[in-house]
Regions:
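An accessory alpha-helical subdomain
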Residues: 1-30
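Short alpha-helical segments enriched in small residues
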Residues: 23-190
Length: 190
């Protein structure tokens, strides 16, 4: 068992001789269990690639609005060939969680997209993220302590948190659940 840390991801590897593959595969569920909500993806398919594949398989389109991540989500998803209808980068502005959710509903309707994903600006280590689907809107205010990291690392962390919400929705999981070391401060559903 080994690991490689490259914030925001810690890569876990279980390696050994091919003759012991069955033993390693038997151990892997325990590793997955210990990782819990911190598990982002398994194998070599990145989270943006996984999201893009699932969106294509389910014939869903997505539109994005980014403040803090400044277009990083659009870059990641377009690089993975996601069915991205539109994306916008807005200047930082103070928003309540209800406002983020409301504007996301409007954005989905305006762009005729199946899904809309918004990342607001960061205030006091907290960020609003909203996902609007055909069934409704799930918005969360998350607290994470990442101020010691460079701006681009904090942006990658927030992009990963937003994509995790999408992955959870696509997999039928609780969208507003805790994300490991990230604390859910507030939720809002429309």
């Amino acid at each position: 068992m080994g690991y490689r840390s490259s914030t925001p991801i810690i890569e876990l590897k279980l390696t050994g001789p091919a003759s012991r593959r069955a033993e390693m595969e038997a151990i892997w569920p325990k590793v997955r269990e210990v990782a819990g909500d911190s598990l982002i993806f398994e194998g070599t398919e990145t989270l943006p690639a996984q999201i893009a594949r699932c969106l294509r398989e389910q014939q869903l389109s997505i539109t994005l609005s980014e403040q803090f991540t400044a277009g990083l989500l659009a870059l990641q998803l377009s690089g993975a060939d996601a069915p991205l209808l539109a994306s916008e980068v807005l200047p930082a502005q103070v928003e309540t969680l209800a406002q983020t959710a409301h504007w996301n509903v409007d954005r989905r309707s305006r762009h005729l997209a199946d899904l809309a994903l918004s990342i607001a600006s960061v205030e006091d280590d907290e960020i609003n993220i909203a996902l609007t689907t055909p069934q409704g809107t799930h918005a969360v205010r998350l607290r994470f302590n990442a101020s010691r990291y460079a701006l681009h690392i904090r942006q990658e962390i927030c992009a990963m948190m937003a994509l995790t919400l999408v992955r959870r929705w696509l997999n039928g999981q609780d969208v507003t659940a805790s994300q490991g070391w990230v604390q859910v401060v507030e939720t809002h559903t429309v």
